[in-house]
Design a protein with these regions (language model features):
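Conserved N-terminal structural module of periplasmic/extracytoplasmic solute-binding proteins
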Residues: 6-10, 24-217, 252-255, 261-264, ...
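N-terminal secretory signal peptides that target proteins for export/translocation
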Residues: 1-3
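Helix-loop-helix "hinge/cap" segment bordering the ligand-binding cleft or interdomain interface
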Residues: 173-248, 266-312, 317, 321-324, ...
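Conserved small-residue motifs centered on glycine
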Residues: 66-67, 391-516, 521
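Flexible loop/turn segments at secondary-structure boundaries
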Residues: 70-74, 103-107, 128-132, 183-186, ...
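C-terminal motif of bacterial Sec signal peptides marking the signal peptidase cleavage site
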Residues: 19-23
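Ligand-binding "clamshell"
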Residues: 132-147, 173, 332-362
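General small-molecule cofactor/ligand-binding pocket signal
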Residues: 94-100, 299-300, 351-354
Length: 550
């Protein structure tokens, strides 16, 4: 690894953060190779016989940083959650959680590391754009390496299935455990498409039963809904399409025409080009502009804000919104908000997910990362703590551990059925729906080892109709007939000073420019002019890619 200058302290006084203390007493099927049980070992006594010993006789206390620290290991009533108590007792540990928020976690972690006052275990959440900083931290000796995974079969099994996860090994040593995604059965493909009012599509007679629309069918449907106004908004008041976020436009509207528009593309000869310079990227801009001028796209899309989707969808003005990735949790949030505003309507009769083929007659999507967020150990952590923590991770990524993270305590909250499947034993509410007793306080500590997007699809706490919708959407975009734009880890995490400087904020500049050009009187000329001017600034990045990634 290229030597990076050691980080100097940014502050003079160590930051001391007091979090909630969750104390526990002594310890009284994914396709993983073992169940991860490391609770006992056997050692010979002085007679030559063997006897069981408990490797966790000494109570160890960990400090850990996490978002939602105030919820970690607790119930909504503020009482210790039984699942976390069970875990602490199994490994004879206590945790003090140091609080982070989504707005401060980057800067706060930097402060802790630069002042050598970080907790034992750190939530890093290193995105590719911050990978150079991670390498600098490793080079500065701020993290303790994880032990050889050959001695931890469950961790090794998970690690070997990842590609982006391997980027957190430097010179053959793993310095942060990547929280793996449990969606490998879908090849990590992103299930895009639209959240839309299927009842409106039915009302105008253009609903497709499989809810997969051709490009032309979708354009006609949106136009017809606006014209016929099944929501009774009044002439010209129904919104056809909008994106929920500014960064999703135009990628999830017409991005299938040029899937590399916001990034770089490597040609068959190995050379790299900047996405906006591709001829098909101009076609994306022109097509999006045509849809905008024809009134299919919301007139205020160039100025979209975070609340615009909910306000327009819940009030019955919006027909369809782009989806960056279909999840049960995301759909549940949309439905819950909509249902509050529309108590007389049944959401399962009105809201659904649409898949829209590109102009080539095929669905297209992008491959997602195989991990999200990472947990690093402080370089000052003791050998004993490092071993105990790694043992915990080994259990938590096992089949039993996966079920524990998702369901709770075996034979209390779930059990294996005779056929090996998992039977959920959660209590039911007055409506007969099963209720997750640990929904409040599990994520802050469980996210350290793995994500559970895949579990959502079978989580009985969510309505079956939602789970079925998202499963169908994921099946469509993971199908062999769908064009999948692969994620190449070496490119996604490529970093050096010249490249990082050239691409800083570049993607945002592209989608911001496209939004601005929706009011252009000569969009082809204006787009071409901007791309030509910007290309000179981007060229150093292309040079670095051509020199280092062939």
């Amino acid at each position: 690894m290229k030597k990076i200058k050691k980080i100097t302290a940014l502050i003079l006084i160590a930051v001391m953060i007091m979090g909630g203390l969750s104390a526990c007493g002594k310890n009284s099927k994914e396709d993983n190779p073992t169940n991860g049980d490391t609770a006992t070992t056997t050692t010979p006594d002085n007679t030559g016989d063997t006897q069981e010993t408990n490797p966790y006789e000494k109570t160890l206390k960990f400090t850990m940083s996490t978002v939602d620290a105030e919820k970690a290991g607790l119930t909504e009533a503020g009482e210790p959650a039984e699942n976390f108590k069970w875990l602490c007792e199994k490994f004879n540990v206590e945790f003090e959680f140091w609080p982070l928020t989504w707005s401060n976690y980057v800067d706060q972690t930097r402060m802790w590391l630069n002042s050598d006052s970080a907790p034992d275990l750190m939530m890093l959440d290193v995105a590719p754009t911050r990978y150079s900083e991670y390498l600098a931290w490793v080079d500065a000796g701020l993290f303790r390496e994880y032990p050889d995974l050959a001695n931890y079969p469950n961790m090794n099994h998970r690690y070997e299935k990842m590609t982006t996860g391997k980027m957190f090994s430097v010179d053959g040593k793993l310095y942060a455990w990547p929280a793996y995604m449990d969606s490998d059965q879908y090849n990590y493909s992103i299930a895009t498409g639209y959240t839309y009012r299927k009842d409106w599509a039915q009302a105008v007679g253009l609903f497709q039963e499989d809810e997969t629309y051709t490009w032309d069918e979708w354009q006609t449907l949106v136009k017809t809904v606006i014209e016929k106004d099944p929501g009774n908004n009044g002439a010209g008041k129904t919104i056809g399409i909008m994106s929920k976020e500014n960064w999703a436009f135009p990628k999830y509207v017409a991005g299938s025409i040029s899937p590399y528009m916001l990034t770089f593309k490597q040609g068959t000869d190995g050379s790299w080009v900047w996405g906006p310079t591709l001829p098909e990227s101009l076609e994306v801009v022109k097509t999006t502009k045509e849809m905008y001028d024809n009134g299919l796209i919301w007139s205020d899309q160039p100025m979209v804000t975070d609340n615009d989707f909910a306000n327009n969808f819940n009030s019955g003005k919006l027909f369809a919104a782009t989806i960056s990735n279909s999840t049960v949790i995301g759909l549940n949030e949309i439905v819950g908000s909509w249902e509050d505003a529309n108590p007389d309507l049944k959401p399962e009769d009105c809201i659904s997910l649409a898949a829209v083929e590109g102009q080539d007659g095929k669905l297209l999507t992008w491959q997602n990362a195989d991990q999200w967020s990472q947990t690093a150990m402080n370089h000052n952590i003791s050998d004993e703590k490092a071993k105990r923590w790694t043992d915990m991770v080994e259990f938590l990524v096992s089949e039993d551990g996966y079920n524990f993270r998702n369901f709770g305590i075996q034979d209390v909250d779930w059990k294996y059925a005779a056929d090996g499947s998992v039977e959920c034993l959660w209590p039911t509410d007055a409506d007969g729906n099963q209720v997750n007793p640990y929904a409040y306080g599990t994520w802050p500590w469980a996210r350290t080892v793995g994500c559970t997007d895949g579990f959502e699809l079978v989580n009985p706490a969510f309505p079956e109709w939602m789970r079925n919708l998202v499963t169908r959407q994921k099946d469509k975009y993971a199908d062999a007939s769908t064009t999948l734009i692969p994620l190449v880890a070496e490119f996604s995490f490529f970093t050096n000073e010249t490249y990082d400087t050239a691409v800083a904020g570049l993607e945002a500049e592209i989608y911001t420019k496209v939004a601005e050009l929706m009011t252009s009187s000569d969009i082809e000329a204006d787009w071409t002019k901007w791309v030509t001017q910007k290309s000179a600034e981007v060229q150093p990045a292309i040079d670095e890619l051509n020199a280092n990634l062939k």
